[in-house]
UniProtKB/Swiss-Prot annotation:
GO molecular function: ion channel inhibitor activity; potassium channel regulator activity; toxin activity
Top-level division of the source organism's lineage: Eukaryota
The entry's keywords: Disulfide bond, Ion channel impairing toxin, Potassium channel impairing toxin, Secreted, Signal, Toxin, Voltage-gated potassium channel impairing toxin
Entry protein name: Potassium channel toxin alpha-KTx 8.8
Keyword Secreted appears in the UniProt entry: yes
GO cellular component terms, semicolon-separated: extracellular region
Lineage start: Eukaryota, Metazoa, Ecdysozoa, Arthropoda, Chelicerata
Amino acid sequence: MCRLYAIILIVLVMNVIMTIIPDSKVEVVSCEDCPEHCSTQKARAKCDNDKCVCEPI
């Protein structure tokens, strides 16, 4: 039973860490905002399945 509580505690801590430190590469940007978003990264805007993809110039 103690192991079960330890596993649950570890999972909860990992969830909190992932919430606090999100993956910086994953940014959901709509196609309308894509050109502005990619211009800040000096990249070319491209929409792929309604997701913004910035291609290096």
